């Protein structure tokens, strides 16, 4: 069985992070390591006392998404890795399902929730269906930021920004993996709960 690290990344999500951490700790297939990073906000200082089994990087200064993700990626020593926004959470059998798949990168479907989910539906409605009051977002032939991938392959590519309005570091990584012939598999199950909430749109 391969080893897995889950990197939980927070920026102004300290009020939601415990929910995310709990969803990783309760996985039916436990991760071998959990790394948590607060990118210079300072709202996650309460977490180490509650969840001492998690390894923390609590930055004093903000590095920005791309540099932060790249730094955390290079800290990973397990066979596989997943990045997870601290405002989101996983279904309890996610790692068990994904770890059984022989691939360089595994993408799976998303359940979009939260009081701002409609905005995402307005842009990607052709990929979404109603699901238990939320939205089911198929990622067939696509990517997302919480895909599970082989660490050494990802580290050889690295997270890079596009320089545009959105950094798209995860899309850039996914495309380069495909360019290098990576084997990609898709799981037709909504394993990631993607929370669209007001903090997503607050500018500081």
Where are the regions a protein language model picked out?
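Short aromatic/hydrophobic "clamp" motif used to bind/position activated sugar donors
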Residues: 81
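A recurrent flexible, glycine/aromatic-enriched loop bordering the glycosyltransferase active site
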Residues: 129-148
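A conserved acidic beta->alpha catalytic loop
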Residues: 37-46, 61, 85
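Acidic donor-binding loop at a coil-to-helix junction in glycosyltransferase catalytic cores
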Residues: 165-173
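Short, acidic, metal-binding catalytic loop of nucleotide-sugar glycosyltransferases
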Residues: 22-31
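Conserved donor NDP-sugar-binding/catalytic core segment of glycosyltransferases
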Residues: 93-121
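N-proximal low-complexity "stem/linker" segments adjacent to membrane-targeting elements
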Residues: 1-23
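Glycine-rich, basic loop-to-helix element that forms the pyrophosphate-binding segment
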Residues: 59-76
